[in-house]
């Protein structure tokens, strides 16, 4: 995979092991709750297992914003999209732009829909996904119909 330029501020960088950069994102308890509904930070082992899974079951990228890695996004082979933006960079419309690009990538792969699983308390993510065109189909399930 090659880097994918999203716009003048955001580039997807293909995943490579970089725990020194990524682990601090997953040390933030608010982010851990948003992502996994857990109240403890990721260990290095948990982070490595997560990325080992994501990078072998889909297209996994770091999100580079203005030259800084600020999160990750994956389009899984099972049509699920996963995204994390570290807290310091949330509310800058980074997630929205990344998910819109993931919809394009899903179309290119011939996927007919993509799903996102969002916890009921994560209203910030729910609003963003709904505003893009995802439809809530279950307590935590949101689907974007491509075809």
Say what each PLM segment does:
Residues 1-52:
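A short, well-structured alpha-helix characteristic of acyl/acetyltransferase catalytic modules
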Residues 7-8, 64-66, 145-147:
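Active-site beta-strand termini and strand-to-loop segments that position acidic
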Residues 15, 85, 118:
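Hydrophobic adenine-recognition pocket in adenosine-nucleotide-binding enzymes
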Residues 37-88:
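Acetyl-CoA-dependent GNAT
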Residues 91-106, 123-131:
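Conserved acetyl-CoA-binding loop-helix of GNAT-fold acetyltransferases
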Residues 106-118:
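Conserved GNAT acetyl-CoA-binding A-motif
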Residues 117, 130-147:
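Conserved catalytic-core motifs of GNAT/GCN5-like acyltransferases
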């Amino acid at each position: 995979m090659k880097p994918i330029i999203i716009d003048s501020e955001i580039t997807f960088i293909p995943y490579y092991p970089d725990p020194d950069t990524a682990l601090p994102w997953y040390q933030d308890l608010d982010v851990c709750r948003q992502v996994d509904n857990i109240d403890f930070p990721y260990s290095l082992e948990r982070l490595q297992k997560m990325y080992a899974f994501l990078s072998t079951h889909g297209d996994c990228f770091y999100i580079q914003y203005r030259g800084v890695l600020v999160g990750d996004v994956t389009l899984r082979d099972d049509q699920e999209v996963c995204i994390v933006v570290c807290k310091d960079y949330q509310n800058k419309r980074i997630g929205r732009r990344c998910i819109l690009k993931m919809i394009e990538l899903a179309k290119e792969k011939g996927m007919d829909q993509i799903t996102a699983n969002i916890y009921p308390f994560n209203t910030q993510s729910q609003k963003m996904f709904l505003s893009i065109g995802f439809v809530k189909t279950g307590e935590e399930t949101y689907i974007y119909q491509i075809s």
